[in-house]
A protein has these predicted regions:
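N-terminal acidic leader/helix
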Residues: 1-30
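Acidic-enriched, low-complexity/disordered segments with a strong bias for Aspartate over Glutamate
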Residues: 7, 18, 28, 38-41, ...
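Short glycine-rich, basic-tinged beta-strand/loop micro-motifs
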Residues: 22-40, 65-68
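Detector for the mature cores of small, proteolytically processed
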Residues: 40-71
Length: 71
């Protein structure tokens, strides 16, 4: 798991909100960045995976599809 800069967090939140009208919640943990969604949505999940893949990172979601971290 890894951390990302706050600028990148804001860019992700803006991109998801502009595209889907929902909020991504950011959780700054001591060792890494974590994120959550209010409800699972396969379209948003795919968007986030692709978004980070383009930046050379990998978003890993939990089984419920509501939380993810980066690798």
């Amino acid at each position: 798991m890894k951390s990302i800069s706050f600028d990148k967090v804001l860019a992700l939140k803006q991109a998801v909100h502009d595209t889907f009208g929902v909020n991504v919640h950011f959780h700054d943990l001591c060792s890494h960045s974590a994120f959550s969604l209010d409800e699972p949505d396969e379209r948003i999940r795919a968007f986030i995976i692709d978004y980070f893949k383009k930046q050379g990172d990998r978003a890993v979601f939990n089984a419920a599809g509501t939380e993810f971290t980066l690798e």
